[in-house]
Amino acid sequence: MTHNVAILGASGYTGAELIRLISQHPSITIKALAAERKAGMEMADVFPHLRHLSLPTLCKIDEIDFAQIDLCFCALPHKTSQEVIAKLPGDLKIVDLSADFRLRDPEAYEKWYGNPHAALEQQQEAVYGLTEFYRDEIKGARLVAGTGCNAATGQFALRPLIAAGVIDLDEIILDMKCAVSGAGRALKENLLHAELSEGYNAYAIGGTHRHIGEFDQEFSAIAGRPVKVQFTPHLLPVNRGILATTYVKGDAQAIYETFAKAYADEPFVELLPFGEAPSTHHVRGSNFVHIGVTADRIAGRAIVIVALDNLTKGSSGQALQNANLMLGEDETAGLMMAPLFP
């Protein structure tokens, strides 16, 4: 059976990544591509690396016949996404890649994103889209909210440990290095090559990064009490990848065994041999997550390192993984390509 999909926001990085992945999918066809400011253009003119694919001409959202669409990927900016999704057909399956439906509490959304939520009915309906932990809910969902790329990385490092009670919940430090593509394709002065290359800086210091809202929501729900991690992201002058170094108080061997049990049957999560450290090089362009555990020299402390590709597993790959479940397809369809190396 072939499923027809539409991609809204197809001219951004996550939209292009969705097209790349879906082009290898055995049973999904791209029926419509929307990009309001580039309507009428061909994808080959927006992203020349997709020139070999036969794709629909970019159009406006209101030009799409959603009666012909089985599932819609919404890769629009937050705030815009909720406005658009609220107007889409009520029976349409949707995977949203923005931040608009990740937080269940409307007050939390307003706190982190600065605006009241304009689609409260859809917000309450949405299922959080971290596939490995919400698989059953996603299968029956109409609207799935993709996670933040940083939020996904941190959760792969910490969710099983919090659930198993093998770490001190008040002693968690999360240090994350993020590729520049995570900031999107819009022109910004601080992301110009001359401003960014050959440098490295922290940002959103002091607990102000918006993805902390997801950490607070998810970790506290698992623990049954408030959990607050100390999180600082850093911007790297690279195109793809996130590397999270997590410092926790707990027995390193118990932590390793917890991961081994939690991820034993996960097709996209690779637990490295004890003491080995992941690299973003080894997950680039893939839907895989690599996790490493090392004992710290300080007794009773451990270091957990997680690497993933922010555009693939952190966004578009996760979105396709969720779409597979929603459409009744094999979860891994279109996603088992090997990472790009070197």
Swiss-Prot record:
Keyword field: Amino-acid biosynthesis, Arginine biosynthesis, Cytoplasm, NADP, Oxidoreductase
Record-level GO BP terms: L-arginine biosynthetic process
NADP in keyword set: yes
GO cellular component term of the entry, any: cytoplasm
GO molecular function, one term: NAD binding
Active site positions: C149
Record family assignment: Belongs to the NAGSA dehydrogenase family. Type 1 subfamily.
Protein name: N-acetyl-gamma-glutamyl-phosphate reductase
Species this protein is from: Ruegeria sp. (strain TM1040)
Gene: argC
